[in-house]
């Protein structure tokens, strides 16, 4: 932790309970000061003033800490301090126990009535994400569409895991839509759901996560039982997961609906060949097991 030298010191409360020493000034301008409700991202080290012992550090975890400002998610002294900071500012803040963990403390590492010292660096902040429950139906559809398009951009760059996150995020907007009665919005919702689930099936097939590919392709077929792309992706996932009979059925139906699609036809032929090989192997393994009579046959001339 940085040693206190001749730095600017600011009393953030009238009683001196929260005192901030600025170690590195932040960016100028009002736009660089976080507001109530913003999601802030910080790095910090916390120690006890009495012993100098470090009890917590985001650096040790190598992961910055995020919280929503003035929402009761952290101790009061933190809300007061970080509210006064600017982006890229680094400070040392002294927090009396009434603004920290009080006379109860916090576990074994922070005894009651402890004065706390934190070195905090404000890395960034942004407006908190709006709750899905606060969106109008129109906003849900538009947001889901926009996020799906972001997923498509990741997919084009072959950033498959990033694309998966976006497609799933888009679908989250439709978790509670049972009471929708606007047919235009329902049709748009259906198209986005089909598109996202198809894309997720493709992504999971690429990642060889066949159970998840099966799940998302099946969701499309619940909406549109003759969706050729879903049948194809489901067939491919079933085939590579070892469900050859199901795969053959999926791919046969897809080929029947779209007989000119070479990818479907080639996958169907591959599946048929895999099925033949599997049956041949089964025959070699089990074919002669029972053709010599019962496993335990009495000897003809056994003694009574």
UniProtKB/Swiss-Prot annotation:
Reaction(s) the record says it catalyses: [protein]-peptidylproline (omega=180) = [protein]-peptidylproline (omega=0)
Enzyme class of the recorded protein, top EC level: isomerase
GO terms under cellular component: cytoplasm; nucleus
Limits of the PPIase FKBP-type domain: 37-126
Known regulation of activity: Inhibited by FK506 and its derivates, such as ascomycin, and rapamycin. FK506 and rapamycin inhibit peptidylprolyl isomerase activity but not chaperone activity. Inhibited by N-(2-ethyl-phenyl)-2-(3H-imidazao [4, 5-b] pyridin-2-yl-sulfanyl)-acetamide (D44). Not inhibited by cyclosporin A. Inhibition of calcineurin phosphatase activity is enhanced by FK506.
Mapped TPR repeat ranges: 144-177, 194-227, 228-261
Gene Ontology molecular function: FK506 binding; peptidyl-prolyl cis-trans isomerase activity; protein dimerization activity
Effect of residue 148 to A: Severe loss of binding to a HSP90 C-terminus peptide (MEEVD)
UniProt keyword list: Chaperone, Cytoplasm, Isomerase, Nucleus, Repeat, Rotamase, TPR repeat
Entry's EC annotation: 5.2.1.8
Consequence when changing residue 199 to A: Severe loss of binding to a HSP90 C-terminus peptide (MEEVD)
Entry's localization field: Cytoplasm; Nucleus
Biological processes per GO annotation: chaperone-mediated protein folding; protein folding; protein peptidyl-prolyl isomerization
Superkingdom of origin: Eukaryota
Pfam families: FKBP_C (PF00254)
Family statement drawn from the similarity comment of this UniProt entry: Belongs to the FKBP-type PPIase family.
PANTHER family for the chain: PEPTIDYLPROLYL ISOMERASE
Subunit structure: Homodimer. Interacts (via TPR repeats) with HSP90 (probably via MEEVD motif).
Function according to Swiss-Prot or TrEMBL: Has peptidylprolyl isomerase (PPIase) and co-chaperone activities. Assists protein folding by catalyzing the peptidyl conversion of cis and trans rotamers of the prolyl amide bond of protein substrates. Inhibits calcineurin phosphatase activity in vitro. Plays an essential role in merozoite egress from host erythrocytes.
Domain free text: The PPIase FKBP-type domain contributes to the chaperone activity. Required for the inhibition of calcineurin phosphatase activity. The TPR repeats are important for the chaperone activity. In another study, these repeats appear to be dispensable for chaperone activity. Dispensable for PPIase activity. Dispensable for the inhibition of calcineurin phosphatase activity.
UniProt name for this protein: Peptidyl-prolyl cis-trans isomerase FKBP35
Native source species: Plasmodium falciparum (isolate 3D7)
Phylogenetic lineage: Eukaryota, Sar, Alveolata, Apicomplexa, Aconoidasida
Gene designation: FKBP35
């Amino acid at each position: 932790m940085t040693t206190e030298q001749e730095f600017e010191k600011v009393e953030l409360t009238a009683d001196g309970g929260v005192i901030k020493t600025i170690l590195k000034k932040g960016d100028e301008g009002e736009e660089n000061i976080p507001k109530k409700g913003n999601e802030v991202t910080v790095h910090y080290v916390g120690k006890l003033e009495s012993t100098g012992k470090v009890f917590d550090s985001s650096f040790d975890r190598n992961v910055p800490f995020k919280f929503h400002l003035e929402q009761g998610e952290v101790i009061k002294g933190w809300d007061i301090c970080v509210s006064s900071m600017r982006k890229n500012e680094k400070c040392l803040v002294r927090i009396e126990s009434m603004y920290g963990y009080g006379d109860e403390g916090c576990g074994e590492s922070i005894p009651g009535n402890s004065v706390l010292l934190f070195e905090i660096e404000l890395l960034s902040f942004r407006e908190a994400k709006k709750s899905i429950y606060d969106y109008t139906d129109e906003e849900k559809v538009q947001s889901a569409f926009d996020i799906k398009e972001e997923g498509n951009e990741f997919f084009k760059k072959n950033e498959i895991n990033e694309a998966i996150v976006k497609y799933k995020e888009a679908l989250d907007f439709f978790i509670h839509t049972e009471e929708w009665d606007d047919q235009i919005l329902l049709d748009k919702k259906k198209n986005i759901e089909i598109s996202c689930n198809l894309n997720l099936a493709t992504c999971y097939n690429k990642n060889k996560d066949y159970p998840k590919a099966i799940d998302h392709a099946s969701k499309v077929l619940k909406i549109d039982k003759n969706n050729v792309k879903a049948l194809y992706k489901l067939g491919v996932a079933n085939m590579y997961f070892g469900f050859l009979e199901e795969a053959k059925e999926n791919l046969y139906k897809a080929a029947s609906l779209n007989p000119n699609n070479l990818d479907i036809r080639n996958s169907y032929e591959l599946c048929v060949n895999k099925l033949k090989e599997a049956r041949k192997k089964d025959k070699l393994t089990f074919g002669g097991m029972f053709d010599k009579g019962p496993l335990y046959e009495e000897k003809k001339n056994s003694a009574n």
